[in-house]
Amino acid sequence: MKDKRLILGVTGIRSDYDLMSSVYRAIDDHQDLEIQLVATGAHLSDSYGFTVDEIRSDGYVVADEVESLLNGDLAPTRVKGLAIQLQGIVQTVARLSPDILLVLGDREESITTALVGSYMNIPIAHVGGGDRAVGNVDDQVRHAVTKLAHIHFATNRESAERILRLGEQSFRVFDVGNPGLDRLLQTPPMDADELSSRLGFTIKDGEPLIMLIQHVIS
């Protein structure tokens, strides 16, 4: 009998790792749980900073590195990468036999991990189900992961209600908030001078500032 439950998280890029960092830390600090991570996708690319090194520097065990990025901008390239990733995650999960698989949102590693867990009868915990991103494939992937998952950690009440409307049992759905806010709350605010230095142009206290963020269509 294992002393601790093994939670295997799968992360594919710095952005999802940052969002989940407080969750990983809480698991790591729990006396009855063990966290290991699979690094895949952009984490293993020099073009994106080879951020698997950041995961290790944070003190986490990287259970495996699953290469999945292929050069090319066409849709078939992304699907081929997904297929490669699926094979790699199968091998890792078969070797480790984790108690729970942990995924975030709507990316390739979310759907591949959820498929592996479903076919191998391993519970899947999904963070960020029920959210909406109209106009791209993310919505379909996220809802598909929801239907494959067993435990749902929604980031807001509306998303939790959407998960319930998809037919999930209420005792499996938890409205826990967005874990990405934990990192923001722990980050000291910058004054105008420091922000100006970071951005490379002058910002003055009290003057209006507009920030525009564009989410690419995937």
State the predicted function of each range:
Residues D3-R5, P208:
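Nucleotide donor/acceptor-binding cores
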Residues L6, V10-T11, D18-D28, S68-S170:
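Active-site and donor-binding regions of nucleotide-sugar-utilizing enzymes
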Residues E34-R78:
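Conserved nucleotide-sugar phosphate-binding/catalytic loop shared by glycosyltransferases and other
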